[in-house]
Amino acid sequence: MNEILFFSPQPLFSHMMNENSRVHTHSNLRHIFFSEIGIGISGNSFLLLFHILKFIHGHRSRLSDLPIGLLSLIHLLMLLVMAFIATDIFISWRGWDDIICKFLVYLYRVLRGLSLCTTSMLSVLQAIILSPRSSCLAKFKRKSLHHISCAILFLSVLYMLIGSQLLVSIIATPNLTTNDFIYVTQSCSILPLSYVMQSMFSTLLVIRDVFLISLMVLSTWYMVALLCRHRKKTQHLQGISLSPKTSPKQRATQTLLMLMSFFVLMTIYDTIVSCSRTMFLNDPTSYNMQIFVVHIYATVSPFVFMSTEKHIVNCLRSV
């Protein structure tokens, strides 16, 4: 009996240490995530305001201005919705009903889909802008913005239809302990659908992601090839010993290439982790890490786009 009393505190102490470590990690993730959300909301608000003022004052706009302004609006709304959802992830309210859960999660997933569609179309548009006059893409320059806008609208409606299964599967977390539900927030969970329905919707989402990412990869590869060809031609004309200056259009393209590459990696990471959570792992800590990582693009992108705007750069340098 004495041996039992002597050794029994050890598992309890270990459990308390693990629990304290988990709470500490959760608290750190909460502070980091809300800081990320705050920075992203500020950056996208500033970028959106810049494009609105640019339009009101009648400045000459580029073909990419409308998609970039639309992307900043989408990211602003997405981060605002995510900030509201995150309060129920990191702060245990458990006060949402089915309607609130369905509305917020579905709206967030639609905005995520719009972000993917707009980013992909922006990559294609930049490839069209950069294409030389002799290219077969040159004929799309005049009507490219109209085509891109129609494509974004079509893909958005298509994704809203595909994502409508969330209106059925998202429910308020019941007051019972079960491993069948997939964690979303403290108040909301995903009710697993039948194997056939889950496979069908997952296949449609994978097809959509593969199609849009393939467009981004192809347009990125095309832009890299054009930049390399232009650089070789410039070096041949000016001499290899001289380093040719990069034009503003090329600098903007190079910046966009880095941003697109990062976005593709984040999308692939999100897809892999989401599938693993659905099939194998339902761990809230890994889920919190996932939502932090996948929002880096929405947080960083407005500052990257602003770095290519000469008016903003000159204004900041004069301060």
From Swiss-Prot:
<feature type="topological domain" description="Extracellular">
    <location>
        <begin position="87"/>
        <end position="109"/>
    </location>
</feature>
<comment type="function">
    <text>Putative pheromone receptor implicated in the regulation of social as well as reproductive behavior.</text>
</comment>
<feature type="transmembrane region" description="Helical; Name=2">
    <location>
        <begin position="66"/>
        <end position="86"/>
    </location>
</feature>
<keyword id="KW-0589">Pheromone response</keyword>
<dbReference type="GO" id="GO:0007606">
    <property type="term" value="P:sensory perception of chemical stimulus"/>
</dbReference>
<keyword id="KW-0325">Glycoprotein</keyword>
<feature type="transmembrane region" description="Helical; Name=7">
    <location>
        <begin position="286"/>
        <end position="306"/>
    </location>
</feature>
<keyword id="KW-0297">G-protein coupled receptor</keyword>
<keyword id="KW-0675">Receptor</keyword>
<keyword id="KW-1015">Disulfide bond</keyword>
<keyword id="KW-1003">Cell membrane</keyword>
<feature type="topological domain" description="Cytoplasmic">
    <location>
        <begin position="131"/>
        <end position="150"/>
    </location>
</feature>
<keyword id="KW-0807">Transducer</keyword>
<keyword id="KW-0472">Membrane</keyword>
<feature type="topological domain" description="Cytoplasmic">
    <location>
        <begin position="307"/>
        <end position="319"/>
    </location>
</feature>
<feature type="glycosylation site" description="N-linked (GlcNAc...) asparagine">
    <location>
        <position position="175"/>
    </location>
</feature>
<protein>
    <recommendedName>
        <fullName>Vomeronasal type-1 receptor 51</fullName>
    </recommendedName>
</protein>
<dbReference type="InterPro" id="IPR017452">
    <property type="entry name" value="GPCR_Rhodpsn_7TM"/>
</dbReference>
<feature type="topological domain" description="Extracellular">
    <location>
        <begin position="172"/>
        <end position="203"/>
    </location>
</feature>
<dbReference type="GO" id="GO:0005886">
    <property type="term" value="C:plasma membrane"/>
</dbReference>
<dbReference type="InterPro" id="IPR004072">
    <property type="entry name" value="Vmron_rcpt_1"/>
</dbReference>
<feature type="topological domain" description="Extracellular">
    <location>
        <begin position="1"/>
        <end position="31"/>
    </location>
</feature>
<feature type="transmembrane region" description="Helical; Name=6">
    <location>
        <begin position="255"/>
        <end position="275"/>
    </location>
</feature>
<feature type="transmembrane region" description="Helical; Name=3">
    <location>
        <begin position="110"/>
        <end position="130"/>
    </location>
</feature>
<feature type="topological domain" description="Cytoplasmic">
    <location>
        <begin position="225"/>
        <end position="254"/>
    </location>
</feature>
<dbReference type="Pfam" id="PF03402">
    <property type="entry name" value="V1R"/>
</dbReference>
<keyword id="KW-0812">Transmembrane</keyword>
<feature type="transmembrane region" description="Helical; Name=5">
    <location>
        <begin position="204"/>
        <end position="224"/>
    </location>
</feature>
<dbReference type="GO" id="GO:0016503">
    <property type="term" value="F:pheromone receptor activity"/>
</dbReference>
<feature type="topological domain" description="Extracellular">
    <location>
        <begin position="276"/>
        <end position="285"/>
    </location>
</feature>
<keyword id="KW-1133">Transmembrane helix</keyword>
<feature type="topological domain" description="Cytoplasmic">
    <location>
        <begin position="53"/>
        <end position="65"/>
    </location>
</feature>
<feature type="transmembrane region" description="Helical; Name=4">
    <location>
        <begin position="151"/>
        <end position="171"/>
    </location>
</feature>
<dbReference type="GO" id="GO:0019236">
    <property type="term" value="P:response to pheromone"/>
</dbReference>
<feature type="disulfide bond">
    <location>
        <begin position="101"/>
        <end position="188"/>
    </location>
</feature>
<feature type="transmembrane region" description="Helical; Name=1">
    <location>
        <begin position="32"/>
        <end position="52"/>
    </location>
</feature>
<comment type="similarity">
    <text>Belongs to the G-protein coupled receptor 1 family.</text>
</comment>
